[in-house]
Amino acid sequence: MNAEIIAVGTELLLGQIANTNAQFLSEKLASIGINVYYHTVVGDNNKRLQKAIEAAEERADILIFTGGLGPTKDDLTKETIATSLDEELVYDEKALALISNYFKRTGREFTENNKKQALVLNGATVFANDHGMAPGMGVNKNEKVYILLPGPPKEMKPMYVSYVEPFLRNFTTGENIYSRVLRFFGIGESQLEVKVQDLIDGQTNPTIAPLANDGEVTLRLTAKHQNVSEAEKLIQHVEDLILERVGEFFYGYDQEFLHYKAIELLKRKGLTLACAESLTGGLFGNQVTENAGVSSVFKGGVICYHNDVKQHVLRVPEEVLHTDGAVSKECARYLAENVKDVLKADIGISFTGVAGPDASEQKEPGTVFVGLSIKDEPTVVFPLNLSGSRQQIRERTAKYGFYHLYKKLEEI
């Protein structure tokens, strides 16, 4: 079955809040075999909402609305749908009692407009709001399914999980959708696509969807099957074919981000890390500390932005700074080796370069050096030539640091 998600609220069109509900619902619907082909956003306007309903009825089996169930005059979703379906709005006694009790407990006046939140379409399946007041509802009419949900994510998400998904499963074929995301770094999207183009062209079940995001490339493999284990087998076969070709750039699955993978490997190896950050200005260390329990492996870092700090704290020779420059292979090497020694760590990693927008030391923006010094191993410096805005260059540099750290740890 096909679904359309219609988000109602002028605040969405004004950009005052992000439509995170659509992302959540799309992912959940896909997992039970319901395809989402359209996302629509419409303001708090009866006529425009009616047009959106008519358009959705032409192209979707399931219409899911978020927002517009509240007590104010511009909350008009259920009124508009009631008119469209020629159905009455009636009070749901459980919801009415819940709202009434809330106002009694808080000592506030229970006004007529607040009663409005307890109105539901006559004959609808009512979804209790365990985290708010306005209930949701589901209606099956004219060979279409209409789902009305509250707008606040803290109310909508638990309502969907507890009540809406079981309701929707009555209308599905029982076919499950199973997805797995393969994460790659160090290879561009176009280069990766060339390597697996024949697999993409021949995709049926599972499908392969590439996506580039800030220096990384992901491949989402999606299979449909009534049996989850059979869907997993379909995906595993395609994954094996992909990794035969580009496995050297693969580092993880789904939400396994680079910084998480690198820190987990540090923990398993029982090694400690220190960082010297010039270009990145603390970005790398910040991402390190996003991982729980990282104090067991992270000694700390030095933000050595000024050359005085490079020279006097991390002992980069003055001659290197004058001759090679702060943005150089030699400087990166000294920074990595000396931060390791100063902070008594097993591994030192360093970042120096030009973030832009202007050149520095006659070196163009995007000129970057990442140093990596591991005890009992020769120091390695990775030169990079990155593009993008100042912030993008800094963020991508930190990612390259995690990538090279992860790959080096795999070899030890």
Swiss-Prot record:
- Gene3D superfamilies named in the record: 3.30.70.2860, CinA-like, MoaB/Mog-like domain
State the superkingdom: Bacteria
Q: Which cysteines are joined by disulfide bonds?
A: none
Family, as annotated: Belongs to the CinA family.
The name this protein carries in UniProt is Putative competence-damage inducible protein
Q: Which organism is it from?
A: Bacillus cereus (strain B4264)
Q: Which gene encodes it?
A: cinA
